[in-house]
Amino acid sequence: MTDAQMADFGAAAQYLRKSEKERLEAQTRPFDIRTECFVPDDKEEYVKAKVVSREGGKVTAETENGKTVTIKEDQVMQQNPPKFDKIEDMAMLTFLHEPAVLYNLKERYAAWMIYTYSGLFCVTVNPYKWLPVYNAEVVAAYRGKKRSEAPPHIFSISDNAYQYMLTDRENQSILITGESGAGKTVNTKRVIQYFASIAAIGDRSKKENPNANKGTLEDQIIQANPALEAFGNAKTVRNDNSSRFGKFIRIHFGATGKLASADIETYLLEKSRVIFQLKAERNYHIFYQILSNKKPELLDMLLVTNNPYDYAFVSQGEVSVASIDDSEELLATDSAFDVLSFTAEEKAGVYKLTGAIMHYGNMKFKQKQREEQAEPDGTEDADKSAYLMGLNSADLLKGLCHPRVKVGNEYVTKGQSVQQVYYSIGALAKSVYEKMFNWMVTRINATLETKQPRQYFIGVLDIAGFEIFDFNSFEQLCINFTNEKLQQFFNHHMFVLEQEEYKKEGIEWEFIDFGMDLQACIDLIEKPMGIMSILEEECMFPKASDMTFKAKLYDNHLGKSNNFQKPRNVKGKQEAHFSLVHYAGTVDYNIMGWLEKNKDPLNETVVGLYQKSSLKLMATLFSTYASADTGDSGKGKGGKKKGSSFQTVSALHRENLNKLMTNLKTTHPHFVRCIIPNERKAPGVMDNPLVMHQLRCNGVLEGIRICRKGFPNRILYGDFRQRYRILNPAAIPEGQFIDSRKGAEKLLGSLDIDHNQYKFGHTKVFFKAGLLGLLEEMRDERLSRIITRIQAQARGQLMRIEFKKIVERRDALLVIQWNIRAFMGVKNWPWMKLYFKIKPLLKSAETEKEMANMKEEFGRVKDALEKSEARRKELEEKMVSLLQEKNDLQLQVQAEQDNLNDAEERCDQLIKNKIQLEAKVKEMTERLEDEEEMNAELTAKKRKLEDECSELKKDIDDLELTLAKVEKEKHATENKVKNLTEEMAGLDEIIAKLTKEKKALQEAHQQALDDLQAEEDKVNTLTKSKVKLEQQVDDLEGSLEQEKKVRMDLERAKRKLEGDLKLTQESIMDLENDKLQLEEKLKKKEFDISQQNSKIEDEQALALQLQKKLKENQARIEELEEELEAERTARAKVEKLRSDLSRELEEISERLEEAGGATSVQIEMNKKREAEFQKMRRDLEEATLQHEATAAALRKKHADSVAELGEQIDNLQRVKQKLEKEKSEFKLELDDVTSNMEQIIKAKANLEKVSRTLEDQANEYRVKLEEAQRSLNDFTTQRAKLQTENGELARQLEEKEALISQLTRGKLSYTQQMEDLKRQLEEEGKAKNALAHALQSSRHDCDLLREQYEEEMEAKAELQRVLSKANSEVAQWRTKYETDAIQRTEELEEAKKKLAQRLQDAEEAVEAVNAKCSSLEKTKHRLQNEIEDLMVDVERSNAAAAALDKKQRNFDKILAEWKQKYEESQSELESSQKEARSLSTELFKLKNAYEESLEHLETFKRENKNLQEEISDLTEQLGEGGKNVHELEKIRKQLEVEKLELQSALEEAEASLEHEEGKILRAQLEFNQIKAEIERKLAEKDEEMEQAKRNHLRMVDSLQTSLDAETRSRNEALRVKKKMEGDLNEMEIQLSQANRIASEAQKHLKNSQAHLKDTQLQLDDAVHANDDLKENIAIVERRNNLLQAELEELRAVVEQTERSRKLAEQELIETSERVQLLHSQNTSLINQKKKMESDLTQLQTEVEEAVQECRNAEEKAKKAITDAAMMAEELKKEQDTSAHLERMKKNMEQTIKDLQHRLDEAEQIALKGGKKQLQKLEARVRELENELEAEQKRNAESVKGMRKSERRIKELTYQTEEDKKNLMRLQDLVDKLQLKVKAYKRQAEEAEEQANTNLSKFRKVQHELDEAEERADIAESQVNKLRAKSRDIGAKKMHDEE
């Protein structure tokens, strides 16, 4: 379509198709199909990328965001050429894969082209904004257009369906599917808008209606949407206008394609939203529209405010939506009601019920006092809702709180709890809303129903998309099940039926399984014993619960179906009970409340009120409601009444869904897939993973593949022959008969098309995608040619007729002129005047006769027309009714067929089950006999146990009596405690007064006083209860002995019962397994039950008896549990004996429970066995289920009680232990306090005031005493601990003394070693100073050397630049030379050999230099920052390396001796270090303890003084009392005695501390001696180190001489370099001469430049890679010689270049292969280099760590001289560090050896052809490296050697840094050269592009010139024809005139 044609779409054109300019730009965009690709990405699924390289099945690509990735080659997917950008049909993509489809959709979406074809269906992406693509202009533009003639659009899909309906005479359907928020509802509205616009009823006069508000049928169809959306749409998390119901809209058309009528079917209204919404969601729109206050009269009528937060049902989530104007929507809804011809009463009824639901949510109820029943908490809202519903408020509240329930044949009033009332209100509100919505749909259908004839229909399906929420319930299962069925229908239609059609037609086709079969999931949900079936079955049983439903699901499906899984519950999320694997993902479902939702129960009392409501609409809604009891009573009237009342929600949904699928299968479906681009509702943003998930789930990619692989278009042979015969009429002659198939074969065979694009079936010809469009284009072109020819002939004929008319006119004019002249001559005759008067009169008479005849004929025709119209209307009405009946009959036949199939399957299954069950019944009868025998035995055992239980009960009764006595005594003691606490309250007041007087001591003593008061209370109570408790203990001990005997008997009985219990449990397990297998099958076997009736009745009676006994035992267990609880609480407050007794009682009760449990287990076994046989009768099913539920509850309760009792036992044991501890403490306190308390109680009556004051003082004393006792206890514990530690120390000291005696023997040797170390340290310090001076000079020398080195490297860089230039020129000349070498093959072979040799040499040099550079670069990169600090160590290590080479043998001997001594000293030092550490820690501990004890002693002394002062005060106060002085004196003496004891204990502790201090002092002295010895040894080591430093200085001198020699060798290398520069200059001159010669041959080489450029690029890459690798001078000289030889050869062969071009091309290919090989080798070397760098980096970091640790060790060693303990720790660390360094050193030595060995090999290979000077230098380098290696080996066992190896590494680091700088310079030079080369290439490419553009311009001008010449020729021929024609006309005129 051109831009001019797209102008018909108006402003929507830019949103539908790219302009011609954009298409042209896209086609001319640069694109390389080899490199442009898609690569996988973790975040974006796929990203665009360019291939950088391919190697070994791996591809390296650079993504569009600059990231480089390496992936497998099969993961790379090619991009489509630019002309396919934003393609409208993705089936036409060249490369069809996931990223191509994704990016096509993404690019179109970015341009706001939201519709895209995908094979046979359409994909639409939600734009989240308004686009102008749905106006009337666009509708008109799409009308009658073929799919290929217009851009993709929902209107195009709709028009195609409309055209198919008319041409194929078949019903159509449009299935709009997608996730929630993808835009399904909007597209549905657009489809309806399109049909209403293009297929409106033709005659406008018929649309006129006397009722102005009703509107036309198309208006009513369009206005049905706003009405339904107001009541059925709501805001959700993902969509602001989400349809919460599904709808199938059928638009009926007449035979001519005009609208006839419409109807709507709805599915699954989400009625739970009426009473509950999530936070981010809201209720249905109608509630907020009413509350928007746009129509205030509505608020007054409904008695509501305009604040949504006043109503609970509508304010749980959000109350407003930014994208929706509720007030405007209210007007739209109200006007929609008017257009749909709702009456005012109906509208008011709908609004009233909506308002009543809001008032329902505000009704409040509360619980009656002392009852569980509910009563109203205010009646205002109930009054409002009752008024709006036309009810009585009191009756409504009564029905809610006290509903009438039918029990048997009578009705009983039942009281409801508050929760039950609220649940009932919610259920009623949901039911009212749902029934009102369904009534609205029925009412709208009645409006849309017309008497017009209906021939066909187009159905539009808009149903809720697949839903996966955090909380998925029954509604989500129904919605997802519906989507599963629709997806299966899509898959079946697209994949299965399509391929079955091919096989049926006999086309060669291999069946492709696209893996899209969803039948397993569908069967899991809907088949017998599926989820829905089990749910409906559970709803039939009154005792069933959600958990029994879950258990059945698990039993039937877990592990048996792959689609049914156990969920993974995550903390923080809602609990899930099972998971289903749907096509769109795995969904976790929560089954809570499913049974209630499925049964959907209502309060039938309130429903009865609804049925009698004065509001007509309310009574209508519930007029058809029938409960279970009404169903029973209505048996006689109608058989279906009862069945309908028991129909569950799931069954109703399945029935509606099956009808929908049946309807869809009879239509031709058109699929529209809606895609949600992102979760944020952001326009223009596409989330790639989200879109890819939807594409995979929706089968978009599979649809495209089947469209491309299969044959989506097919035509019957007859239709094809009739339509396309025009393409070649000669192939099918008209005169003879030819079979339609043969005619089609001949016709297609004669056409110029791809004959693999179609296949012939038995009845149809099949076409691949696109071929039918091509045939249509050919047909249109043929028709246009034929029509053009016809038009030409017609125009010619018309012109000839016109010419003839002109001639006739001319002749007529001549005749008229002659007649006029004649008339003018006779007009005045009298006879002529008479003629003029008579003539008109004759004609008027004739016309009157004709008019009369016509009127008569008109009357007859009018009568006939009226009769035919009446007859036609009757026939049309009959036809409509017959069609409806036919459709209904078809549905019934289909349903009957399905039922018949199900019945047959069930019959077969029942026959099989019957055989199995008969065999199992026999087994069961045998087992029943065995069980009866076992039952008899168990009953006997049970009697014995009952006897034992009775005996135990007697014992328990006795125990209960004793417990009752204990309880009474406990209460008495508690009363006494209360009295005492009252008295103590008075004491507390006095204490408070005294504490005010003693403010200084308030904070310290207040808490102690309170604690003491509480203890005194306890003492009072305990002393009083002690005597009584002792008596009770004696009684309890006697009963305890009896209980022990009973316990032993019970133990024996328990063991016996446990054995029996195991046997019964095994038999129970077997029976349970059999029961689960037979449960469902035995329901359908009624005819076998009669044989077992008598046995069942007996068993039932026995079960009832056992059940009664079980209840009695259970009651008895509960009583025992209560007794145990009471006993547990009492045990918490009594002593050890009571706790022991309670434990014994608990064990007895536990044994009793076990004995009772055995009987209960037996009862359960009998009951289960009874339940299995009772299941054989349907009448006993309910009783069996009740027994099972009761048994399960008892089992659970019993298990819970046993577990609880076990926990109680554990708790009581813990409490018992705690009480035992408290008892022991209390006994100790009682012994101390009882005497004091007795004396205080005696003195209390006489001296109350004095006693209180004295008691206060005594309390203070006691507090202090307790503190003293605690501190004394602490001291005693510390003393005991110190004594043990002293004992340990004494033992250790003895060992140390023995060890010291051994150490003293080696003391002399150690002291000598320490002196040596000190001397070494001093020498090393002096050497450091000397080295510092030497460092400055060496730095100066190093700077000079660095400058020389830099100059040398600059010169080397210049050499490299010249060399690279020469190499490039040589490569150019070599290519030219090779092109001309056709006649000199022998010379070319020699050149090839030389080139191969050069390449080999280059590779060897590359390997050598690469190895050397890698080692140097690695060491340099890391240690660059530390080079200044490490220079001293470098010089020192160089000097040491030279000097130590001479003294190696002597030093090795000395080193071995020192090593031995060092190890011995280290071991001794370790032991002494450990001893020192332990002694120091002990010393610190003792010091701390001593200080603490001193502090305590001081505090005690101060407290003693205070106490003495207070005692003196008390004695004065006691003097006044007189009588109690003697008693108080005793108390004082006791306190003094205790004080003296404390003092003596403190003195003993002090003495022990002094003793320990003496020991510690002795240990310190010994420690100081050891430290002094160690210091002396360190001094000796320092002296040795100084000596080593002096040796190092001598080595530095020798290294200086070697450096001078190195400088001289470098100067010699500079001289050689300068000489080579001169040689290179001469070669440049020669090359310039050769260039002048070569310029003459450039003209002949243009044809081969394209090949040479690629080769040149590859050679340049190889040269650059070699330049990066530091080539040496020998290779440069050898190449120069080769270059001179080649230049001479090139001069000789320049003239022959043209003849040798063809041979050179072949040689170029071989050379490029060699270059690629070289490049791959270079890359491998570089990778190896990087690996070695990383290894060396790791080694360097480890060495750095070792150096740092060594430095830390040195500092710690210095500190060790001043602090022995710290020195020992640092020595230990030094020892660990040295061991670590030794290991590191060995690894470093091995690594350096490997690297050195490789370096030597590389240098030997690289320096084969070098000069002697270079060989000397390399030999010198190898000598130095050998010396370094020897030095590293010699110093391997000591820390000194480690430091020297580190310094050597630093030297290498410095050298590497210099080499790195040189390499950087070389790299810069190479980069400059590469830039120049790129510039030359760019210039050449620009010239080539300019040439191409000039050539294209020339071709264009040439083409235009040819066209102009053709036009001139055509014009000239036309002029000649016109001239000839004019000459003929002139001649003809001349002839006529003659």
Curated annotation (Swiss-Prot):
Residue segments, region Disordered: 1909-1938
Residue ranges of domain IQ in the record: 783-812
Subcellular location: Cytoplasm, Myofibril
Compositional bias of kind Basic and acidic residues: 1925-1938
Region Actin-binding, residue ranges: 657-679, 759-773
GO molecular-function term, one example from the UniProt record: ATP binding
General function of this protein: Muscle contraction.
Name of the protein described by the UniProt record: Myosin-6
Naturally occurring in which organism (per UniProt): Mus musculus
Gene name of the record: Myh6
